[in-house]
Amino acid sequence: MSGKMKTMDGNAAAAWISYAFTEVAAIYPITPSTPMAENVDEWAAQGKKNLFGQPVRLMEMQSEAGAAGAVHGALQAGALTTTYTASQGLLLMIPNMYKIAGELLPGVFHVSARALATNSLNIFGDHQDVMAVRQTGCAMLAENNVQQVMDLSAVAHLAAIKGRIPFVNFFDGFRTSHEIQKIEVLEYEQLATLLDRPALDSFRRNALHPDHPVIRGTAQNPDIYFQEREAGNRFYQALPDIVESYMTQISALTGREYHLFNYTGAADAERVIIAMGSVCDTVQEVVDTLNAAGEKVGLLSVHLFRPFSLAHFFAQLPKTVQRIAVLDRTKEPGAQAEPLCLDVKNAFYHHDDAPLIVGGRYALGGKDVLPNDIAAVFDNLNKPLPMDGFTLGIVDDVTFTSLPPAQQTLAVSHDGITACKFWGMGSDGTVGANKSAIKIIGDKTPLYAQAYFSYDSKKSGGITVSHLRFGDRPINSPYLIHRADFISCSQQSYVERYDLLDGLKPGGTFLLNCSWSDAELEQHLPVGFKRYLARENIHFYTLNAVDIARELGLGGRFNMLMQAAFFKLAAIIDPQTAADYLKQAVEKSYGSKGAAVIEMNQRAIELGMASLHQVTIPAHWATLDEPAAQASAMMPDFIRDILQPMNRQCGDQLPVSAFVGMEDGTFPSGTAAWEKRGIALEVPVWQPEGCTQCNQCAFICPHAAIRPALLNGEEHDAAPVGLLSKPAQGAKEYHYHLAISPLDCSGCGNCVDICPARGKALKMQSLDSQRQMAPVWDYALALTPKSNPFRKTTVKGSQFETPLLEFSGACAGCGETPYARLITQLFGDRMLIANATGCSSIWGASAPSIPYTTNHRGHGPAWANSLFEDNAEFGLGMMLGGQAVRQQIADDMTAALALPVSDELSDAMRQWLAKQDEGEGTRERADRLSERLAAEKEGVPLLEQLWQNRDYFVRRSQWIFGGDGWAYDIGFGGLDHVLASGEDVNILVFDTEVYSNTGGQSSKSTPVAAIAKFAAQGKRTRKKDLGMMAMSYGNVYVAQVAMGADKDQTLRAIAEAEAWPGPSLVIAYAACINHGLKAGMRCSQREAKRAVEAGYWHLWRYHPQREAEGKTPFMLDSEEPEESFRDFLLGEVRYASLHKTTPHLADALFSRTEEDARARFAQYRRLAGEE
């Protein structure tokens, strides 16, 4: 290793280089590119200097379109400008990319390349986004791994300045952007020597200046437009040599050889793969292995994709090549081939001795590519007629594009590399601990290190698998670990759900966090699990990290215990030295959370090493027989064939045929109910003797895992053991039971916290103690549907309505889901939902687990997601589409009244026409009308037509859901337009005051003083008052609510909003894990109450109907604040951490925040006529 070595991921490497060359960064958060901008923002806040002696000026915009516009403007003003983006965000920049390229401006777009949303959304890596901008005129430079991101990102900036062409500098999303590697860092002093100062001076002089003004962006006619476009050709013709020159200089600095196209392999290769991105490292491993066995193969790795230089291409490709396979990580439906393949075929167009060239697609949406997949490509090239247009790594049994597996398993050498896998659960700290571990190994030892983290889409409580490799040589294996030396599991429930030991080498080590004794292990471990441990001579250890963490006061955060145990077992470095390093990491990671938290975690490190228990594996485990398979319960095909394999982490094995009939992205509702994840450590247990039957616990439950049930006498007598009940208050004919699903509960504890009963009618107990209650839950859900004996617009009555949102993947204690669940209880059987991309779309529709469900009649919310930026328009379009069909129905029904129909049908049609826009009673009217049409339609075309459209008889309740990032920022223009349209749509904004889905970035909803990403020193601008802006139209129903503060007001506002025959907007305060509640998310509802009592959040409603009635339309539902505003702020880490680091600044900003809140409250009082 020469030079300074540091452990970092691809995003950090790109940020490090770009910071040096950047004066202005205009950004907008989007996964997986956001950490690049976050790094830049953090360094700028710390005063870090770029090459020009200044901190970077970073500006978060309202959208990627806005970011691209700001990039364009800053470049025209003469500042070196950069942005960071991916996927749909990059596509929003396309119009400005054309402009920036056409105006020869040296901007750089760093892209962590990601899949595009087509029939579904996918946040993982491929090249669909970058291939969609190859026509813009921007140069395109690709990197294969983290080290190349460090080295070649500099080339993008340097060549942009010298060549006057903007660059798209890209690398694979997640696989490179989030992979942690130990790499050599280029120092700014080195980069400064490469900068072409005269070219930079020329750029500055060419900027827009009033001292020597010019005009740019003229409107041109056909006479000159074409010629001026062609005049720019010479810049593109010169660019490849400029890039090659800078690559030569970088190579001289680093000792790593770079060219526009890098060839590696046999000098006389006959078969060559051409590719770009992280797959090249996998291909390289295969090439080395095959050549060592005497074959003649090679790899041509593409770096400069645009402009595509034929001279440099042929200079690198061996003359001996006879067959070429081109790998594209994108899909262009209808094209003859994918882009890189077309370029390669075109390169040989005039060559009489051209090799045979085939192309294939691989790794769309982050699919893993293994060495055996690449071996299959080389096998394909050996065939007399190689398959063209193939797919890699899947089984296509529909259109038969997939390559068959390699003829024999390829044994790629990983000698000297130790591979470790860590199974964890989102929010249990496993990923964070492993990031600390890999940095300790990388930065504190001579070893090379690599880490990659795979996740599912659940917000927390989902599965995570950390893949760590370390060894005495560079590690370039960009795929998941399938042969491990060490495996750890932090969740004991996983032993029954996943094949944890798959790939663990003979003699390897397995560490399990569990509370089981050795005797209990015999009972709980599956037979196949025990057999593998015994037959493969596995070293098996357990650690009761849960109980130790609880005793230490760490709750469910036992990550440090497990990490310390890993260091002791792995023996990579001296355990005591490792413990010291871990303790230092704790101080750095948890410094903002106070001395007590630091001390608890440091003590956990000590106990993690001291409390390990080695299990003596009984000899008889090796000869255990698999028990007879039990007959599975009847289940839908989708559950058996798709959901269950995916939930076992076997989705990669599903063939294309599994999705025939789902090609448009349609998934069935209600699939989350089949998961039964059992992720809670503790779950609530009903104590009927103290229960007041208020149903508040069900009202606020984020996962709909608590539900009141009414049993008639027969059902009560037939109830299973364990079903407790008491006489129902207000419904004497029934027994009341509070059903709790232990396997669907996330264990947040909000139900216990808000229970008003003296002594609490709910108590938390361990999940294991309540598993036997699952049949009781099933029985309660299967009870006969009953008419609600209470008004459903009351807190108590609403909870006797079936929730049509259940068991989502939202965080424990989520502040968003209770609102959505409540709305489904009120209107769910006739709802259409347009959902903006964000947290609510991820917990709302992460395949295959869909929490939106149906009632006993099969009715429920129909849900769809378009994009982040267009959700309001999308929802309006839904409403207009349904409205158009219903207008046709109304016309046909009016005509049908002239037909000789029965009085019953005539009356049903008249009633429908008179009340078609009324929600109350719409289902009953629709049912009656459908019934009469079915009886009389035969032989009457008009009635037949009406009956065919019967699904539209029910008045639909159109809802538009989204977070504050959508409503306040990227989607605000569309939201404003929809509100101004006057159309009858209902909008619900989950206001978490940050971009929750991308990790807590600042939005225009973020108040002054809050620390958020892109507001590292506290936000300085006032929170936008979205409600007041909407209210200015006069005909929009607007409400601000906080369920935890006033459940009745929340319910009233939602009911009024839906009933208002025009646009309505409900802004709902939602506590979020990003707020860092010191009381924990078990108090998220209480936090909303504190926010209102302190005057931080205000409750109000604006009803246009009241003005028509001569009343004040604005109703202030909040009382005068009585609690301490400052104490409320200090109860959340997002505010308290600023006070810890810079108390004087925090005090000043806290005062501003409180003044803003008081000013808003005073204004609300005036509007309500209280002053």
Swiss-Prot record:
[4Fe-4S] cluster 3 binds at residues 811, 814, 839, 1072. Keywords: 4Fe-4S, Electron transport, Iron, Iron-sulfur, Metal-binding, Nitrogen fixation, Oxidoreductase, Repeat, Transport. Binds 3 [4Fe-4S] clusters per subunit. [4Fe-4S] cluster 2 binds at residues 701, 745, 748, 751. [4Fe-4S] cluster 1 binds at residues 691, 694, 697, 755. It is an enzyme of class 1 (oxidoreductase). Pfam families: EKR, Fer4_7, PFOR_II, POR, POR_N, TPP_enzyme_C. This is Pyruvate-flavodoxin oxidoreductase. The lineage of its organism: Bacteria, Pseudomonadati, Pseudomonadota, Gammaproteobacteria, Enterobacterales.
